[in-house]
């Protein structure tokens, strides 16, 4: 049977399309090219995250300057350290870092914290001089850092003299390299004050002022020179000029407040005295408000407020402000010591014992609650902290002899604390026995304990034998008011 070939009457015969084939060839070749380019990194895949721009050291430097101007000194230090991670050989960054580290030490409370920060500042200045041995500003900042390290409440007298001598040498070298360096001239004046060369200090700072440069550091040093001469009103005027140039640096407000408090302490007129103390409180409150606006948790302004209230005899307000300071640094032993002194002055002798114990010996969690809240942690519904005590030093000796004096005064034959009081008195005697006031306190305490041993308990009022502590106006070391 023959079947005829089907004719394409109703459908098209399949046939090749030249254009379609050309399109597919081009598409395949383009795909191969794209894959190779992606593998080589010339073409980036879709939907990958956008790369984050790498910051330069200049951006961190600008951030550091801005943070310092804003009063955020710790943030400024962090920014400059980030800049140095990118450019560790930049001497100018080391200079700026050292200056801020030095100033920031004024906001720290404990001896150890100040000592550590000042050592870091000096290390930064040393690095600046190493990188730029012919740079005037590097030597000026190293002189500044060494002068602030020469703090007799932090180091012994021999080290103080060594630092002051080296600081003067650096200041002289800075001016030899550039006699137009106004900051070097100002820092030299500050060094001369600490060397008790007041006439030379005045000459140097007047030269710096006559150059007409509007520098915060120059007005600050001029105020410091005037403070050392007892010219507290003029010192306030110059601190205010420094504040006008750097309105967010809270340590300047603390200096003004301290000078007003000193004027109040020395005023014979009761109304004037009260007015001066209130002005002092206003400046400390400004510092606290600036910190609050900046989000800076600094106990310093509240401790300064407490000192002023203590000077005014308003011990309840003083204790409230010390407790506010403890909210920022609840493990700071120095603040416990200051709280103990306030309790002591308000004749809350029993309450002063746990606070002073935490300051000098350290204490467990339960004792820290007793010190802060006057009750157990459970009753206060608070969590206690373990506190590390502070070593005996010129800044902490008041806590030691006050603690021992209270223990002696509260001793009774049936509840005798004199054994512990003897131990503390012996420590103080070994280091500060040549101080007549301290020697008198020790002798009085030992007399009380001798009476207790003989069955003659003291009157509680004998505890008032202790003289003024850290709430006093003028430390022996510097002759300038304490903030």
Predicted regions and their residues:
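Start-of-helix register in tetratricopeptide repeats
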Residues: 58, 92, 137, 144, ...
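Short coil turns that delineate tetratricopeptide repeat
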Residues: 88, 133, 179, 213, ...
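Conserved structural position within tetratricopeptide repeats
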Residues: 82-85, 123-130, 169-176, 206-210, ...
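Alpha-helical segment of the N-proximal tetratricopeptide repeat
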Residues: 53-86, 103-114, 187, 265-266
């Amino acid at each position: 049977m023959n079947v005829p070939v089907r004719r394409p009457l109703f459908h098209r015969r399949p046939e090749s399309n030249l254009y379609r084939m050309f399109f597919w060839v081009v598409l395949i070749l383009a795909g191969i090219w794209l894959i190779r380019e992606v593998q080589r990194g010339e073409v980036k895949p879709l939907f990958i995250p956008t790369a984050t721009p790498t910051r330069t050291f200049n951006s961190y430097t600008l951030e550091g300057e801005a943070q310092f101007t804003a009063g955020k000194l710790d943030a400024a230090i962090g920014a400059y350290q980030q800049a140095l991670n990118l450019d560790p050989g930049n001497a100018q960054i080391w200079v700026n870092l050292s200056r801020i580290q030095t100033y920031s030490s004024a906001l720290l409370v404990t001896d150890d914290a100040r000592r550590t920060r000042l050592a870091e500042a000096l290390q930064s200045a040393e690095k600046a001089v190493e990188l730029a041995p012919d740079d005037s500003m590097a030597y000026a900042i190293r002189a500044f850092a060494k002068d602030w390290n020469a703090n007799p409440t932090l180091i012994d007298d021999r080290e103080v003299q060594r630092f002051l001598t080296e600081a003067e040498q650096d200041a002289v070298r800075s001016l030899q390299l550039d006699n137009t360096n106004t900051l070097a001239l100002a820092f030299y004046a500050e060094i001369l004050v600490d060397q008790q060369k007041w006439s030379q200090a005045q000459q140097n700072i007047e030269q710096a002022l006559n150059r007409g440069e509007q520098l915060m550091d120059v007005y600050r040093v001029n105020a410091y020179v005037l403070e050392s001469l007892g010219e507290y009103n003029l010192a306030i005027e110059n601190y205010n000029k420094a504040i006008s140039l750097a309105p967010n640096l809270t340590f300047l407000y603390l200096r003004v407040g301290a000078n007003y408090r000193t004027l109040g302490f020395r005023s014979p007129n009761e109304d004037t005295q009260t007015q001066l103390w209130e002005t002092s409180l206003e400046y400390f409150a400004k510092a606290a408000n600036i910190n609050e606006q900046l989000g800076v948790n600094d106990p310093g302004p509240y401790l300064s407020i407490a000192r002023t209230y203590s000077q005014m005899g308003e011990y309840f307000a003083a204790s409230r402000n010390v407790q506010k300071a403890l909210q920022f640094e609840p493990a700071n032993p120095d603040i416990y010591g200051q709280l103990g002194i306030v309790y002591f002055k308000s004749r809350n002798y029993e309450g002063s014992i746990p606070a002073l114990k935490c300051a000098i010996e350290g204490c467990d969690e339960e004792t820290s609650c007793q010190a802060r809240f006057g009750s157990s942690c459970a009753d206060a519904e608070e969590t206690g902290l373990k506190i590390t005590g502070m070593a005996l030093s010129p800044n902490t000796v008041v806590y030691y002899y006050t603690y021992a004096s209270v223990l002696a005064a509260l001793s009774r034959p049936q509840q005798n604390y004199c054994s512990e009081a003897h131990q503390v008195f012996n420590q103080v005697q070994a280091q500060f026995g040549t101080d007549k006031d301290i020697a008198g306190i020790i002798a009085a305490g030992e007399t009380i304990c001798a009476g207790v041993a003989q069955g003659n308990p003291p009157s509680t009022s004998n505890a008032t034998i202790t003289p003024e502590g850290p709430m006093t106006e003028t430390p022996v070391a510097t002759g300038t008011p304490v903030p």
